[in-house]
Amino acid sequence: VIADINGEEQMYPASMTKIMTTILAIENLKDLNQEITITNDMVADLYVQDAMQAGFQPNETVKAIDLLYGVMLPSGAECCVALADTVAGSVSDFVTLMNEKAEKLGMTGTHFSSISGLHREDHYSTAKDIALLLRYAIKNDTFREIIESPYHSTSGTNIHPDGITFYSTMFKNLSDT
């Protein structure tokens, strides 16, 4: 860090939350080719909250690796929920894992209460803590491969037999400048 201006000021992390969701899923899934079925219960609240989604549908069976790309490239909340449920059994238990990991990483100004970054009063971080998290996550080869990808075409599924192609919102925004 060359300079730090307000690095410890509390802020709302929004989609930066997905860095923690992704790295925890990568570290806790034994097989990234594991197939996971997205249920109606997983996505019902996301429609109400108008959350950004990658395009997977209820009752669709998707490989974990494709869900990971769906989290980071198009910012898919349904992918976050499916991964959290698979890793921890519930979103709330996954949030507990997120806060435990934040503590281990020394993210003293952070408290997670959302897995996708949807706004909640008790969901906050700091620029310094997000930098710590990103520095940690980028050491993981799978995480780095995902975030460096400008696009990803998923494997075919029972609902999307030709797969879905995701384009990175980060690269899209960079090309708009």
Residue ranges and their predicted role:
Residues 107-108, 119-177:
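Domain-terminus/edge residues, biased toward the C-terminal soluble/receptor-binding domains
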Residues 1-128, 135-141:
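Active-site-adjacent loops and short helices of periplasmic peptidoglycan-processing enzymes
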